[in-house]
Each structure stands twice: as C-alpha cells, then as structure tokens.
C-alpha cells in the first residue's frame, strides 16, 4: 500500500480526530516529509483535509473514502464474497493492468479498482476521461468457457448489473445504449469495455477483462470540450459518503451470480427492456464501407443488434466487434423503449 493510501486510511480511521504529522510518520514508519507529500496529493485528489497548527491533520467526517475493506464489507454472502478486491489511487488503465496480470496467470475473480486513470481507454482505443475525485474505474478478470462470438454476453450482463446498482444508488432511471453505454437523461454515465484473449486451438476464450468506468459527479472544472453535451453524471450533487464503495460492491453483487450461472435468463430480457435504440433509426458504421442508415428492431439472444436497412428487407444482426452505431435522433438516448423479438 502506498504512503498516500496509508495516510488516507489512518485519517479515515481517526473519524475526524486530528493526527499530528509526527504521529502519522511514526505510525507508518515514514518521514514527515513523506506524510506532507501524501497530504498534498490527497488534497489534489479532492479529499477535504483540514490542517491546524499544533494539532495536525483531520479528514472531514462524511468524506467518501474508497478502499478494499469498504468494498468487501458490502459484498453479499455467496459467490461474490470470494472475490479478491484491490483498490489503488491511480493507474494508466485498470484493464491494461489486469490483462498483464492475466498473462502471468492471475486467477479469475481478481477485481482492480482505481480512483483515477491517466490513460483510460474505451472502444476502438478511444480515450476514456478518468479524472480523480469524480468517478469510479474498475476491472474484473474472468476466465469464462465461451467462444469469441459469445464474449458480448459478458458486456450485456455487466450492463444490466451496472444499471441495477446505479439505479439503486442514484434513484434515476438508467438506460442502455447498445452495446456498452449506460445513459441517464440522455447523457453517458458509464462505459463498459470487455477485452479478451483467445486460445487459437480451441477457439475459446483464455481470459477476458471486463472494465467499467462510472461518472459519479461532474469533475472539478467541468467536462472537456469534446465531452460537453455527451458525458453526464449519476449524481447531480456530490453523493453520500460511501457511494463509490457501494457502487463497486453493488455491481459485483449483481454481476458475479449472473456470470457464474451462465444463463441468459437472468439478464437478457432486462437488457432488451433497457435498450434505448430499439425503434429508432441509426447510422451503421462498418470499417471499409460507406455508412448506412437502418431501423433498430431489437436485440437477439446473442446480444447482437438486429436492424433493417430497407422496409421489408431481411433483418440483419450486427455484432459489436464489426460495427459502430450512431443514433440519428437525440430521443434515442433518453428513455427505454419496448422491444420486439
């Protein structure tokens, strides 16, 4: 655990009581300079730490502190309770870190949570804005018995799990924009990225890394210009203390039983019901071919998007790895529409 994380844990455990720099340094076995640097870094991340001469430092009561213990304490008895939880301050990307560990033989069920990412990625390698103090970024290592074409099921069950957990926490309706975006009031509040490594001989997945990035609040200074009008937040005001741990645990409590069960029955109909694109016209973008417009009919049993390019033409199922879709009308972002088979 870093000095920064140890200082945060000590201040959180003090429950608002002041701890002197000397007390912190001796308790952690570090220098007072290291403590001061950790305090400065925590303040830069948005933690409200008060300093009083001759008394020391205190973390304001009610601060939303995220650590592995807080997440573990909220895991329900059952399959999810055995998950291995790690929380870090910052990484280039949680997916990249877990993929490296998967290649070294790390076990299924390892969960890596970061409070910020310096090089977060979304689909097609696009940057994923991951600032400190306003989001939650987590990845889960899986070793599923699935073929490559079935990997989209992981994203679908994760989307349903994340939507359930987010709705419980923020109280607002959450929709899913195929294949991997959670939306609140027309704005993206969560992105999901599943990356997999395949065994070429068997055609089955060797492992998959499921990543989820949530916007809990609008970041300090607002959204970057390129995300204005696109990105949104789960909470209009700062969430209650413990919300990040509750969200992480909520996702795991929902996702892990679905994943272990391996059945579509637990999530497919809800994934369809929460879809925002059904009944709307979209622009279909396939690599190397001109874009085409199509009407979305629904989602099939393999979580592919079923579209019709011309009235009366044969419906076509689109896989997430071969296309991107872009709604042609803004109402497709706003509320779930009942879907057809």
Model-derived features: positions:
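Short loop/edge segments at beta-strand edges and connector loops
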Residues: 89, 176-178
């Amino acid at each position: 655990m870093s000095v920064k994380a140890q200082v945060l844990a000590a201040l959180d455990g003090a429950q608002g009581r002041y701890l002197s720099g000397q007390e912190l340094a001796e308790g952690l076995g570090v220098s007072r300079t290291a403590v001061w640097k950790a305090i400065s870094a925590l303040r830069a991340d948005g933690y409200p730490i008060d300093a009083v001469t001759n008394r020391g430092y205190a973390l304001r009561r009610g601060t939303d502190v995220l650590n592995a213990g807080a997440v573990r304490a909220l895991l329900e008895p059952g399959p999810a309770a055995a998950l291995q939880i790690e929380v870090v301050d910052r990484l280039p990307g949680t997916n990249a870190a877990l993929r490296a560990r998967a290649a070294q033989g790390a076990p299924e069920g390892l969960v890596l949570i970061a409070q910020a990412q310096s090089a977060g990625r979304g689909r097609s390698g696009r940057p994923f804005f991951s600032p400190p103090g306003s989001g939650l970024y987590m990845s889960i290592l899986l070793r599923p018995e699935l073929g490559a074409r079935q990997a989209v099921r992981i994203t679908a069950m994760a989307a349903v799990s994340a939507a359930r957990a987010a709705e419980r926490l923020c109280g607002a309706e959450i929709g899913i924009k195929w294949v991997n975006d959670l939306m609140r009031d027309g704005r993206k509040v969560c992105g999901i990225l599943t990356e997999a490594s395949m065994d070429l001989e068997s055609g089955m997945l060797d492992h998959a890394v499921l990543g989820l990035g949530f916007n809990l609040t609008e970041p300090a200074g607002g959204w970057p210009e390129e995300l204005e009008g696109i990105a949104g937040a789960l909470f209009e005001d700062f969430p209650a203390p413990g919300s990040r741990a509750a969200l992480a645990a909520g996702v795991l409590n929902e996702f892990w039983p679905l994943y272990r069960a391996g059945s579509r029955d637990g999530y497919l109909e809800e994934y369809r019901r929460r879809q925002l694109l059904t009944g709307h016209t979209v622009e279909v973008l396939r690599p190397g071919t001109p874009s085409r417009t199509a009407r979305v009919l629904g989602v099939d049993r393999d979580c592919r998007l079923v579209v019709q390019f011309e009235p009366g033409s044969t419906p076509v199922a689109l896989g997430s790895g071969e296309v991107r879709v872009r709604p042609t009308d803004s109402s497709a972002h706003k509320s779930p529409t009942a879907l057809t088979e």
